[in-house]
Amino acid sequence: MSTSGAVDQYTVLTGDRSKIKDLLCSRLTECGWRDEVRLMCRNILMEKGTNNSFTVEQLIAEVTPKARTLVPDAVKKELLMKIRTILTEIEEEPDEPEDES
């Protein structure tokens, strides 16, 4: 299993993944990012969605790169620090002894 896969599995099992996700959602709401992305989606739909041929997939493809660049550096740094803390905890945990039956 890859390191990222192991971290992903660990965070799911310990509940840290949902904590990280909740932290991200609250920080993005606090800084106005969600409102900004919502407005961006509305504007794109008004420009391109008049004939109903613009799909959700197309909207996501257009908005995602722009939305990622709008995430404040402070939010990115805070999440990175949280993930590093989790990784440190993983490294510091003693390995469970194997059953030698």
From Swiss-Prot:
It is a peripheral membrane protein. It comes from Drosophila melanogaster (Fruit fly). Signal peptide: none annotated. The keyword Transcription applies. GO terms for molecular function: C2H2 zinc finger domain binding; chromatin binding; chromatin insulator sequence binding; TFIID-class transcription factor complex binding; transcription coactivator activity. GO terms for cellular component: chromatin; cytoplasm; DUBm complex; nuclear membrane; nuclear periphery; nuclear pore; nucleoplasm; nucleus. Involved in mRNA export coupled transcription activation by association with both the TREX-2/AMEX and the SAGA complexes. The SAGA complex is a multiprotein complex that activates transcription by remodeling chromatin and mediating histone acetylation and deubiquitination. Within the SAGA complex, participates in a subcomplex that specifically deubiquitinates histone H2B. The SAGA complex is recruited to specific gene promoters by activators, where it is required for transcription. Required for nuclear receptor-mediated transactivation. HAMAP family: ENY2_Sus1 (MF_03046). The gene is e(y)2. This is Enhancer of yellow 2 transcription factor.
